[in-house]
UniProtKB/Swiss-Prot annotation:
SUPFAM superfamilies: Class II aaRS and biotin synthetases (SSF55681), Putative anticodon-binding domain of alanyl-tRNA synthetase (AlaRS) (SSF101353), ThrRS/AlaRS common domain (SSF55186), Translation proteins (SSF50447). Zn(2+) binds at residues 570, 574, 672, 676. Catalyzes the attachment of alanine to tRNA(Ala) in a two-step reaction: alanine is first activated by ATP to form Ala-AMP and then transferred to the acceptor end of tRNA(Ala). Also edits incorrectly charged Ser-tRNA(Ala) and Gly-tRNA(Ala) via its editing domain. This is Alanine--tRNA ligase. NCBIfam families: alaS (TIGR00344). Belongs to the class-II aminoacyl-tRNA synthetase family. Its main location: cytoplasm. The lineage of its organism: Bacteria, Pseudomonadati, Pseudomonadota, Gammaproteobacteria, Lysobacterales.
Amino acid sequence: MNAPAKFSTSQIRSDFLAFFEGKGHTIVPSAPLVPGNDPTLLFTNSGMVQFKDVFLGAEKRSYVRAADVQRCLRAGGKHNDLDSVGYTARHHTFFEMLGNWSFGDYFKKDAIAWAWELLTQVWKLPADRLLVTVYHTDEEAFALWRDMIGIPESRIVRIGDNKGAPYASDNFWQMADTGPCGPCTEIFFDHGDHIAGGPPGSPDEDGDRFIEIWNLVFMQFDRQPDGTLVPLPAPCVDTGMGLERLAAILQHVHTNYEIDLFQALIGKASALTGITDLENKSLRVIADHIRACSFLIVDGVLPSNEGRGYVLRRIIRRALRHGWMLGVRQPFFSKMVPTLVELMGEAYPELVVAQDTVARALLAEEERFAETLDAGMKIFDEVASRSQDIIPGADAFRLYDTYGFPVDLTADIARERGMRVDMEGFEFAMERQRETARAAGKFGGGVALPADLVASMSPTVFLGYEAYDADALKVVALLKQGRPVERAEAGDEVIVFTDRTPFYAESGGQVGDSGQLSGPGVSINVTDTQKFAGQFHGHVGRISEGALALGDVLAGGIDTQRRGKTILNHSATHLLHAALREVLGTHVQQKGSLVAPDRLRFDFSHFQPFTADELAVIERKVNAEVRANHGVEVHNMAMQEALDFGAMALFGEKYGENVRVLKMGGYSTELCGGTHVTRTGDIGLFKITSEGGVSSGVRRIEAVTGQGALDYVADEERRLLEAANLLGGNTSEVVDKVRALTERQKRLERELESLKAKLASGATADLGASAIDVVGVKVVAVRLEGFDAKALRDAMDRLKQQLGDSVIVLAGASGGKVALVAGVNGSPTGKVKAGELLGHIASQIGGKGGGRPDLAQGGGEDGPALATALDGVPLWVKQHLG
């Protein structure tokens, strides 16, 4: 029996932060699991991620000492523990990292002293159960442990380089091949000699006896490209301690899944699944995965088929499959959320705020996967039964493509059965699909600027925020048929680059401007403006008169009416984005947009279709902000200042040091380089025209604004009036009259079905009397006018009951088409197959069909061939009966 827990997980968090706050540290909130402003990293996987730019010197903080509890995820990319989760004592997808930091303030002496004080005096860990490692040349750290702390040399282990490579050591940390780096010292807890395993550095170090609990990294060098280490002028400290591992030690248990937090989650999973064995690995998987999935959704990730969303989907579906293994066939995973909120909501208030969003997103994914999970498992069983120890890559791909099984889920199932997946074959099938998609997506017209031309040009100066036309625009480059030229003539299709321009180049979803460029004796009709190499505005158009050469100076003016309509739609997308987040939740993130003169299209993350009420509320909120006539403010500022200002940045986007912030009253603040109205009232009216799904987890709204919205409303009103006239009433009566018509139609359809049934019943009696005896089997093969497939099946059922041993073919003719049903009943079923018979008939009338041995369906063309085919049925049956 384990000893009672001395420190709860919540208390450990609080103790850690209180201790370091008492040592002059600023307590910093956890960063999201999605790293801000760093597209190179899939997820926050360690405590230092949010401080990366501080260590690199790219960011300054208002403090030099910090402490935090960082939520982390390792389930994709380089750091991926997913396969091991649930099957080992300490692997998790989601975990919490306790950390304290010094940015050029204290160093080794204080870091080591405070770590020892917290462990042995606050948490009362026995000193003789602790062991430390140091980098083999770090004499300073070795001496501090021995002389200041008093640890015997026998419990201080020097760790060298792996395979002799310089600084390639578990005890030497480096961010990259160059940059900040330094030695580290690690603190281990000895679980006792009753647990297998040896101390770090020994051949048995991978055992579970000695568990690392705290890593203190001393960043004291700047690694140069040639590998030399230059001392940093202000050394830093970065420490990390896994909360779950520490809790296991302080609660006197050996595995992380035995701590209070996990036991509560496992208990809830047990209650939901009916499994009472709390050691069950599937319960552990479910308990682990609910944390990862919930916090990913809190941080704006939703299940999808790409990127972070696909990692989330993989984790959810792994949990659902483990529930399926336990016999659960109804949604259960989303019901774990309230328990998680009770356990972690105090530490992470954002989880409480997003509780409903998290539960709804998980439930939607449960319902979606439930449709294919059972069928997919049957396919896996079939594949496994005909394979020996390898699941073919093509079959793994089919499970992925058709049934939504992530390949690591298939590999998980295979591993449980002593099998493995042919990953090479799977990747081959995936690549073939990608090639097909690439081929389908190819289009002409792509033009790239030559590298030498890019090197010779300066970025285009955009004047279009303040001006719609400008003079003295110097031609700095000219493309014709995609190639640089020095001169072009009237009639030539060209792309003109000038040093400055009032023309907006397509970006951020906003279409490029059109208009005119002109100079002495030359005129160019500009139909589009595109951005090249991210910084050069190319005016796409045709020279209508004269000739154009490099160095020419032009005047330019945009189509102001087109721009005017476009800016209404662009500003409306900002209000729409804010309204969506207000109504649906902060999980809503922009996934794409189109801002054109005639409409706007906005793609965003959301996990389920809208209700009519939700759409109406969103539309009302946007129009309320339009009527409020807020002034639209533009601010240029540093990226961090913009985030502090409350500006919303898009996940995964990489922004420069300075950004443009657009603020609309107190309702919307976003980073944006597009063109906009000066007041929200300029938008006039906002009207949603459609809403639908784009892909899994992504919805799309299309809308119109200004005069376009008024025209749309007028068209809708005209259609309503037309409907009212057709119904013989006024517009207020349309709904009631349509409802009455619908009810009448349903009643007439029921009466029609009843009449059809009576007709079929009467026809069946006549058909039975016309049956032909073929070797003791009744054979019926007839054409029935006006019978659809359902009426044919009903007639078939009655004939089978009436005739006993029989072979029946019924052909329902209507509108030049024929529906076919073939049935075999009683003794003939061993020799006569309905599917073969129906295929034989269908082939004669230009059709096809098939089915079971006792019942088959198909169709074809009506005509003389049908009578011939039906007349031949008795002979065909006789031949097959022998």
